[in-house]
Amino acid sequence: MTFDFELVGKIGSMALIDRKAGIIDYTRVARLSRELRPGYIWVSSGATEIGRLDYMQRTGREIAGEHAKTDYAAQGQGILMQTYRQFVDPAYSVRQVLVEHQHFNDDQKSEHLKGLLLRCREQNAIPIVNYNDAVSSEENRRMELLALSHDRKRVFECVDNDETASRIACLVRARTLLIFTSVDGIYLNPDDETTLVQTIGGKDAYELTENIEEHKKYCIGASRAGANGARAKLEFVKDAAAQGTTIYIANAKYSIAEVLSDSVPCTKIGVEL
């Protein structure tokens, strides 16, 4: 298979924030940012939580009400991009790409997004992708997805950036999909670190999909409220794995290079592993 991109990577909010200090983990962001290069697509959560922390530091209080998430996202997205720009190699451009579910449920919008991402690679730019929470209404989104479900066999929500990254990996035919999280990967028993699943493989796409489904049975819970957890990650990556993309689910304390060189503990998913 021919791949258009070397890597689609994703990092979650939990991995970006220094919880004790209540700020961005600048050491981690700097380390990861310096590894980004053209041919990589970086899907980054964190805008909402960064916006919340920034608002609290400036005002001493939190925002109340149903619009808090969108307000925080609007405040945090600029800070998130500024932080990446600060640490990415200055020889490379950094481009903000905000998406919603329509970009994966409408063929014309999908092609437009794909063209943008391909041009980033050609123009020495690194796209930083996030879901556009600032302008996304939960009620409207649900109505739109319901309407789409009448016309399409599959509908992609993509509110979870694990799904966003997986859909992008399919869209651009990525060689590797790397999902950074706050644990080392998928566990047979999430309470026992010795049960880390190192590989999920198969001789072909069909067998691989069956093995992914089997491992979903062991996945319960999530690392934070509102997250979908390991089970959802495995569900989201099935299509990418079936098309030939190699998936890593790894701890964000490691570098991209360490994970891709198979030198640190993680879960690796792919055909004929």
Predicted regions and their residues:
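C-terminal catalytic "cap/lid" subdomain
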Residues: 1-273
